[in-house]
Amino acid sequence: MPKSIFSFFSGVGLLDLGFDTAGYDIVFVNEFKEEFLKAYRFARQNRIADPIYGYHRCSIDDFFTCSYNAFLQHSIHLERNSGNIIGFVGGPPCPDFSVAGKNRGRNGENGILAQSYVNLITQFLPDFFVFENVKGLVKTERHRIYFDELKQQLQTAGYYISDQVLNSLSFGVPQDRDRIILVGIHRDFYGRNQHAVPENNLQFPWLQHALFGNAEEIKAEDWETTDPFHENSNRYFPRQTPNRYRELCVETWFRRNNVDNHPNANDVFRVKQGLHKMQTIPEGDVSGKSFKRLHRWRYSPTAAYGNNEVHLHPYRVRRLSVAEAMAIQSIPAWFTLPTNMTLSNKFKVIGNGVPVLMATAIAQTLSELLDEIVAN
């Protein structure tokens, strides 16, 4: 059965891109920031069809008001009448739950949006949903209490749920990035197939489409640590690192995406201060709070480019370009951001997104589970 996605907090659509790659139809897109929404449309032009119910620049809370509410309800009704499976996907803004962010929790201006998203799900009752956020939502005790309350609300509304902290390394992304993913399937979706209804929580095979195993085992391998920095130097893939992990290396993705010739190759912040430091930090030294130099034959730290964190190119005297940051997020080479988008917003929207390979794997696993329920 066709699967229709209603996307919220879409950003530039990296989570959506994963679902699109896995065969879902993105039919509705909602993003509050105008520049992000314009970039979403720009990146997909001539390659992916526009959502049939349009792009909506508004707050998620607007969907509880008359006109927006009626339009969303009508759109869902049309999809149901077409026999399509309905899904909501979204990652509410996460600075209020991030250890590196404001950490204000449920009462922060972003933190309250997690509640709004859950309220939307429990009002419109899609067949399934995906909720994505930073691991701080479950690793910090007071945030975990809030998360448990949200899950209880979803269960009361009839959803069988499963959540897991996942690391993007497991899915072939050249980046050490943890995210909490929560998925749910509504009890009504099971219909007559009552023997498939979970006894308690949804049994979701989180690593079914993972390219590699446990991320901690990956990180425990014999990776390159640091090497003296030499501008434009050549270094071969190290013998001690298993060859299968070449896929997780920054340099592999730089070459795959041909980042030097990418339309966003010249989108780079020029450093006005700290040039000497950039010339002396060893390749692979990511121990600093601010300046971190990536190693070409290792994975990147989390692609978070705010809070004074500066990621340096492995063998050039500069920061990473937008094209390179996109490669580290496993974004395909054809994906580009518009020239008139501010550089700050380009890095922000990339860093906020879900790595595409990770999103694709989750979408594939969910699709197979939904198909299995329908088939039985």
What are these regions (language model features)?
Residues 85, 177-179, 298-300:
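Extracellular structured ligand-interaction cores
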Residues 240-376:
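C-terminal target-recognition/interaction regions appended to catalytic cores
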Residues 2-125, 135-145:
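Core alpha/beta nucleotide-donor-binding catalytic domains of modification enzymes
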Residues 26, 128, 301-302:
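Beta-sheet entry/capping signal
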Residues 69-82, 95, 99-285:
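Class I S-adenosyl-L-methionine
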Residues 13, 34-35, 93-95, 135-136, ...:
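Short, solvent-exposed loop/turn segments at secondary-structure junctions
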Residues 90, 131, 305:
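Redox-cofactor binding/interface segments in oxidoreductases and associated redox assembly factors
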Residues 88, 182, 351:
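Short, conserved catalytic/metal-binding motifs centered on acidic residues
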